[in-house]
A protein has these predicted regions:
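Acidic, divalent-metal-coordinating active-site segment for phosphoryl/phosphodiester hydrolysis
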Residues: 86-104
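Short, basic interhelical loop/turn and adjoining N-cap
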Residues: 103-111
Length: 117
């Protein structure tokens, strides 16, 4: 089982990114845990039945890397994957940096949209 944490802005289609909610939704039936590590309010306000796709939303009152550390500490998995932006290259947030600080594997949003898992 893998845990996927998705940034929202410039990552998911609901906020200007290339990744469809449908493609994210395909991960859960494969046995993976899927959640948000970004502007989660956009998703819960625009995606009907968002709670059937996403098992966690955050970060709340903490940095992205701290949130990832909390998830990794308490939820055992075979792989931990942050999907999002490279600051200054594909978006404004440093999701790659947060993933590196937390010891998570990183997938750039356009690579995920192209099929990288």
């Amino acid at each position: 089982m893998k845990i996927y944490a998705f940034d929202v802005d410039d990552t998911l289609e609901v906020s200007g990114g290339p990744i469809s909610i449908v493609s994210v939704g395909r991960l859960k039936p494969q046995g993976h845990i899927v959640g948000l590590n970004g502007n989660w309010a956009v998703v819960v306000q625009t995606v009907p039945l968002w709670h059937r796709i996403f098992s966690f939303v955050g970060p709340m009152e903490m940095s992205k890397d701290t949130f990832l550390n909390q998830l990794k500490t308490y939820i055992p998995a075979d792989d931990y994957i942050m999907v999002g932006n490279i600051k200054g290259v594909s978006g404004a947030s440093d999701d790659e940096g947060a993933a590196n600080l937390a010891g998570w594997r990183f997938i750039k949003e356009s690579d995920f949209a192209a099929g990288a898992r």
